[in-house]
Amino acid sequence: MPAARLAIMADDTNYGSLGALAPNWSDGERNIDTDEIYKRFFEWVADVKGVEPWPHQEEAIMDLLAGDHVILNTPTGSGKSLVALGMHFAALCTGRRSYYTAPIKALVSEKFFDLVEVFGRENVGMITGDTHINADAPIICCTAEILANQALREGRHADVGCVAMDEFHYYGDSERGWAWQVPLLTLPNTQFLLMSATLGNVDAIADKLEDMTDTDVDIIADAPRPVPLTYEYTLDPLEKTVELAFGRGETPIYVVHFSQDAALETANALASTGVSSKEQRAAIAEAIKGTKFTTAFGKILQRLLRTGVGIHHAGMLPRYRRLVEQLAQQGLLPVICGTDTLGVGINVPIHSVVLTALTKFDGTKMRKLRAREFHQIAGRAGRMGFDTEGLVIAEGPEFEIENAKALAKAGNDPKKLKKVKRKKAPEGFVTWNENTFDKLIDATPETLVPHMKVTHSMVLNEVEQGGDARYRIDRLIDDSAQTPEQKERLHDRADEIFQTLFDTNVIETEDRDDGGKDYFMTVDMPDDFALDQPLSPFLLAALELLDLESENYALDVISMVEATLEDPKQVLRAQERQARDAAMIRMKEDGLDYDERMDRLQEITYPKPLEDMLQAAFDEYRHDVPWANDYWLSPKSVIRDMVETASDFTGYIARYNIARSEGTLLRYLSDAYRALARTVPLEKRNEQLRDIISWLRVVVRSIDSSLVDEWENAGAGTDASEAAANLAAPGAKQAVVEDRRGLTVLVRNAMFRRVQLMDLDKPDELGALDKDWGYGVHEWEDALDDFYDEHEYVNTDAKARSGELFILDDSKENSEHSWKVRQIIDDSDGDHDWAITGTVDLDTTQSSGEVVFFDYSVSN
């Protein structure tokens, strides 16, 4: 939890020790000279870090102190972070604001806490779009896009003294590379430290940066790898490869896959092969003793961890990923199966990397790994301070492994060898061999291909700066590293955007005495424009289309919010698959022939509530607000679906069979909660919508509280020190029920979900929900038989779900930490003589995100 971590830091004797060596920023103390900066910094490195810097680190910091730019193209584990620390310290000592940028929020957040630990919380801030902590601090951690937008808004006048750009190979990313190029072109007074282990040839970048800033650029690319690597290509089955490495003591092992499903499949296979010792398993059991594995995937993870096998990928809950990282850092996990997220910022010590393939699906096709991708992954092998070398193993293709197995079985018998039928690569299969592996080992990362774009938001950021925005946009394009053909297209795009902004009266110009033009806006830019929720202004406008008195108002607001959020693709695919399966059954029952079924099936997709109304409104909005053309709506129903079906997190995961994508769903729910809580005005919230927002907070917080804490302690305006103080405040969380409204909705939903399943006559699903408190399948079958002997059907309309039929007794909340609840069933005869009654375990319910009962009954 972020605030907790800050509180712990305050007790660390070395907390803020480097920041204490710098002049006081807020008091305007006198700057110190470079010799003294160098002396203080490296004395701190020796005394506090207890390490001796490598020559390339000293060289880089000396270059930075001399005022030069530095491109640090050195291997993984070669201490790039220490150089960045030196740059931040030098900036703090000379009265300059410094920035650290990274491609993903998780890395920004991690670096923020690292810097707080050494510089002190008053000296470090963080901006990630949805999070603002101490944004006026002398050291700012942010995503690359945040800095790029600031550079466009403020240009040469930006208060950006120096920037450490981590993972600079993103400069070559086709979608996001513009954000790494823009600051180099628009901040001529800023010093840059560009860092990555896989930059390739950077001469063109260095020349461009030197030309734009009239400052020398020093390239440091000859640092030796601290832990050398050895390479091995094998045709052994994966399980045997891991077994052999385990036997040779070459653990921990990270087995790299290029899909989440493949990672889990391997983890399950390895869990049964005995990859850990009895002592390791006992240590793991002790380490995870207090961990709650409450979700479906959590139970899978718990089983795997107890065998010594970890799993790590982006679809997991953040708390599960952190747990795996912590166990690995403690040396408790011999094997981790994961995806190639290993290559970006995962903090896991690894001795051996095993690549299960040398190809990957890039979103459009299968292709061989590029040199940069390979070295990003392979470079993680070898633990500095632990290993004398790291090991990188590549598995051959499955068909080649089968061939090798057959040949080995034949031995040296010529007759048997002759009978061996060699398998061939499947048709269309992109294959690889040992030569592929050797070429990747020897290859240097490809030269980064620059990317640039021009959007409405970029133009408006320039206009907001004042002066001749058109000249600066043209200059940005001309100065960019793009080809002449690309520049021509960018100029054409700029023409279109400026014309649109003029036609819609969003911008105007004034002639200057010197013959130039000043551009200015006729409308106010939203405060969070082009950050995490660029369509928030549209959402506010679209809310006016809804009737606050409508029965579906709250659900329609949710649909509007969902249309502005990023798609949780795995969840939507599962919805579509289930909808198509149900449609196929209906079409078969209706006697449709195969071809017609297939044609109709292609038209079926996941639910998109209010699609026509929203699209029409958005088209009109884009006419009046042209910068919205940079974005698009994506109607969907995840939150709404959960509300309408009274689903909790666990039930929704089970319903769509998406246990492997729990993290994806949770991140989406978290984004939805933030959007609802921050964007929808209080006067636009009716009672049902307030209930839903509270319920959503309870769901997200109970599954993984860090996602809510991070935003509420930071994004809502609380600075880091206040967050830590609030967290530690006596009595801050003494209440048995932290969020009464949200928890009440959670319980009501759980009870009504059972009513819905009664209506559908689903004893199997009801039994699965209630077996732990004495109502398994057989008990529910008996209850349903008795109910339907007396009544024809169950109502599930709004009246059946109303508060009149739900009774909550909280008299034992404080004494026994329980609620007595009763859901009256709205039967066909209106007798209301049947009810589901239970005693809710408040503590377990709030920590698990699903309702847990002490006792339970269904009766009349």
Predicted regions and their residues:
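Conserved two-lobed SF2 helicase motor
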Residues: 136-152, 307-321, 327-347
